[in-house]
C-alpha cells in the first residue's frame, strides 16, 4: 500500500438545525472509523481525515477517544494485525465557514488554507487532498458501510421507499 490515495469524511454539516453528523459521531464514532479503514484498504489509501465542526465538542472528544482506542487495538496505525496494511486517521477542526461543506473547499481547509472551492475538473477522485486522488463522503454514508457489509445490500435497500432505497 502506498500513500497515493486519501480518504476523507465531511462531518461539517452546515445546514441550520441539522444534527445527523453530530448524533452519529457522539453515538458511534467507531462506525465511521471502521468504514474509512475498510475504504482505505479497498482503494489503497494509508491516510484518512475527518473534518469535523469545532462547534461539536462532544463529537470531537468522542472521535479522539475512538481513534485512540482503535490505535490501541491495532485497528488503526502501521501494519494493522500484521497484514502489511497501514491506515491512520487524523481529525481536522472546521473553521466555521459554511462554504467548507463543499468538497473542494473542505479539502483546501484540511490542507491548512482558506476554505475556498476549487474549479473542477480536476475532480477530487483525480486530484484531491494534497494533490492525491481522494474519496470523500459524509458521516451518514460512512456510518452505513459496516452495517451494509454485515447485513448485505438487500437489507439496506429494504429500508426507505421503492424510489429511494436505504436510509434517505
Predicted regions and their residues:
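Short, small-residue-biased leader/transition segments that mark boundaries at the very start
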Residues: 1-4
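Glycine-rich phosphate/pyrophosphate-binding loop regions near the starts of catalytic domains
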Residues: 6-30
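Peripheral, non-cofactor segments flanking catalytic/redox cores
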Residues: 18, 34-37, 47
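Cofactor-cradling patches in redox/metallo enzymes
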Residues: 24-25, 33, 55-58
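Glycine- and other small-residue-rich loops at beta-strand/loop junctions that grip anionic moieties
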Residues: 25, 52, 134
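Histidine-anchored nucleotide/phosphate-binding helix
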Residues: 29-42
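Short internal beta-strands
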Residues: 47-54
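Hydrophobic alpha-helical positions that pack around
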Residues: 60-168
